[in-house]
Amino acid sequence: MNNFDIEKTLSTMVCLIDTRERDTKEAEKRYQALGIPYRRQKLFAGDYSAVFTLPTGEEFSMEYLCCIERRYDLTEACMCCTSERNRFIREFERAKEKGIKMYLLIENGSFEKAYNGQYRSKMHPNALIANLTAWMARYNAHIIFCKADTFPKLCREILYREAKEILTNMEVDT
């Protein structure tokens, strides 16, 4: 693809939001803050991905290439290591089997807060850190901490940049 076609394709970005992501007033604000159109559909893995329209008119979906899993805070991340562990691991395994690049964005947290136990869970900080770093090693997951109001911008930017890299290296008949 030439640069013009890549830019044209990227301008058609629609964020895909998993139907299992809770649909609340706060979530609606987050979706609006993405600054691009969005649609809800069941995703294979993760909470967010993207779809684009190629110059040929065909849809180019990132669903099986890149996804973002969102957690509200470290307390919710702890649940991924305890009560929701099996479901969470299955999701990472599914993504790994398909070669999907997985990002885990944790709002309102940091590694410093994790090390200092600044979350509401009985989980020991060492156990939380061990889980987070094991996921990075085992599943090639990218764990990023951000503020809640940064999430929509960062989500959009990650999906945009991932798509741009893929499109730049992709051979498509236009």
Where are these regions (language model features)?
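Conserved catalytic cores of phosphodiester-cleaving nucleases, focusing on short active-site segments
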Residues: 66-72
